[in-house]
Amino acid sequence: MELRKSIVSNGATLILGKKVKSIQQDGVRIDDDTFLSSGLVVNATGSWAPLLTSGIDVKKRKGHLLITDRYPGFVKHQLVELGYLKSAHSVTDDSVAFNIQPRKTGQMLIGSSRQYGVESSQIDTPILRRMLNRAVEYMPDLGSLSSIRTWTGFRAATPDKLPLIGPDVLNSKLYLATGHEGLGITTSLGTAKILVDQIVSRRSAIPIAPYLPARVSELSHA
């Protein structure tokens, strides 16, 4: 809510409840066929980015999460197994890794799983069972907790595991901000900084070369 207030107070107009049908050279067309003209467009639609920008190598990577009932003090800080990075960087096989985060409510958020090539958002019972068995291996007492909800989501993944931040290869008026996988919110401020620096032709304190979309085209043709 505070972010929304800040955006509006700085002169932006928010259009909510509308879907972008297409990105064109000088703007976007939304689902009521209204055309919104713009000097540049930022495609920051996560794993759905390829639907609006053809040719970018971003794939959906499905994940499961589970949240428990309230157990204040059960875990006081996030715990992650060392193999989490290996799971996160796997590019082919389904994988699970132990990750638990206590919430302010006293609930425990438990993950994680990763699956490529899955379009359905339905709960995958076998992969969920693997994920929870992994968690209980690390913390046996988790088996005594009650869960209240399980859900899935899709991460936006790139071949080299780095996000695409910068101008599209085929449209200089289009900028991409996608492919962050599970770190989109965590790295959002840095992503915004890199984008703004490129748009206003300002030297960035953050190296931009590793994130330029052009590098993925180079990888695919290497």
Regions inferred by a protein language model and the residue ranges of each:
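Helix-loop-beta segment of a Rossmann-like dinucleotide-binding subdomain
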Residues: 1-10, 113-116, 172, 178-180
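Helical element adjacent to the flavin cofactor pocket in flavoenzyme catalytic cores
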Residues: 1-25
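Short beta-strand to alpha-helix junction loop
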Residues: 1-6, 122-127, 186
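Active-site-proximal alpha-helical segments within enzyme catalytic domains
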Residues: 5-6, 40, 44-45, 190-198
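Core beta-strand elements of the Rossmann-like FAD/NAD(P) dinucleotide-binding domain
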Residues: 31-40
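Active-site substrate-recognition segment that forms the wall
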Residues: 40, 47-150, 154-169
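Glycine-rich, N-terminal phosphate-binding loop of Rossmann-like dinucleotide-binding domains
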Residues: 45-46, 178
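C-terminal catalytic lobe of FAD-dependent flavoproteins
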Residues: 126-130, 136-222
